[in-house]
């Protein structure tokens, strides 16, 4: 991505080097795979957690005992600082794009805050942990990211490249857009009343909508700033491919269980991201209007 000269967002809390409490153990083998699955689960990173956080948005949320936050002084490497700057530039890009889109549709975009943290963090949705991957909490309208997640994406799934990382952030912001439009709250209220299998189906549609919104952002960001370079789109498509339910489940346990899918197959994730990228039209994000076969 071409980001030279692009502004950084001021809506960032850098809590790296601060202790946010004990990390939560997810207890399902292959911690990185579980983290990636949690990242994609749209408010229900694991079945056991979903019922506790149905009213909250996010790509993972845990409840836990609040503990004192302490500061640990350390210097960050140049790579860590560059990744932090990159993340704030991407957030700034989402602010510019969604402010424009909301204004064109007669509304006002309320920007979210990005929280950078290490290991564990306190949120309005409960205790967060790096094992969960990036997540959005509707309780405080903040997205939380432990930047080490991007290294895990690269080493465990081969999802690498700056645009793949940007896709992750844009997906999180996509859940914030769902919150602002009321979609997130409505769907989670419905999910709380349904069986696990039926709730999973709604979760898939919520996740695919966030993928679509990530594509919409990329379309307009490139139109406004000429940010995309050769290979960028392929990076994001590859990322979407390796974080589908079917791919992750097969990698984690050798087989997939379609009934348990709650964030979409690789094919579905690629389809909706590409649709947003190609059209840039939020009216095309009809993940809740099409049939299961059309997803």
Per-range role (PLM):
Residues 120-146:
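Catalytic zinc-binding patch centered on the HExxH motif and its immediate surroundings
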Residues 149-168, 198-204:
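Short pre-active-site segment immediately N-terminal to the catalytic Zn-binding motif
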Residues 1-75:
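Long amphipathic alpha-helical segments used for membrane anchoring, targeting, substrate engagement
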Residues 36, 98, 145, 163-180, ...:
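Active-site recognition of the HExxH zinc-binding catalytic motif
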Residues 20, 24-26, 115, 143-146, ...:
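Structural recognition of the beta-strand scaffold that forms the well-ordered cores
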Residues 81, 85-109, 198-201, 205-248:
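Short helix/loop segments within enzyme catalytic domains
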Residues 241-295:
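Pan-zinc metallopeptidase signature
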Residues 173-188, 221-222:
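Catalytic Zn2+-binding segment of zinc metalloproteases
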């Amino acid at each position: 991505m071409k980001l030279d000269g692009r502004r950084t967002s001021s809506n960032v809390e850098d809590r790296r080097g601060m202790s946010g409490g004990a990390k939560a153990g997810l207890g399902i083998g292959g911690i990185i795979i579980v983290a990636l699955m949690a990242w994609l689960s749209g408010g229900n990173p694991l079945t056991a957690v979903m019922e506790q956080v149905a009213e909250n948005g996010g790509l993972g949320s845990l409840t836990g005992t609040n503990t004192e936050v302490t500061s640990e002084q350390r210097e960050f490497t140049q790579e860590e600082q560059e990744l932090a700057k990159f993340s704030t530039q991407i957030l700034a890009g989402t602010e510019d794009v969604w402010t424009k889109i909301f204004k064109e549709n007669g509304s006002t975009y309320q920007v979210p805050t990005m929280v950078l943290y290490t290991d564990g963090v306190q949120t309005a949705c409960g205790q967060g942990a790096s094992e969960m991957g990036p997540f959005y909490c509707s309780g405080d309208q903040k997205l939380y990211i432990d930047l080490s997640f991007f290294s895990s994406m690269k080493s465990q799934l081969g999802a690498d490249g700056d645009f793949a990382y940007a896709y992750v952030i844009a997906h999180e912001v996509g859940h914030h857009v769902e919150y602002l439009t009321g979609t997130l709250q409505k769907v989670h209220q419905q999910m709380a009343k349904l069986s696990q299998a039926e709730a999973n189906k709604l979760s898939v549609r919520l996740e695919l909508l966030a993928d679509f919104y990530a594509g919409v952002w990329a379309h307009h960001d490139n139109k406004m700033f000429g940010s995309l370079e050769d290979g960028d789109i392929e990076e994001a498509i590859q990322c979407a491919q390796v974080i589908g339910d079917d791919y992750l489940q097969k990698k984690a346990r050798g087989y997939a269980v379609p009934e348990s899918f709650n964030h979409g197959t690789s094919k579905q994730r690629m389809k909706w991201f590409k649709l947003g990228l190609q059209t840039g039209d939020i009216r095309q994000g009809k993940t809740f209007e099409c049939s299961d076969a059309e997803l």
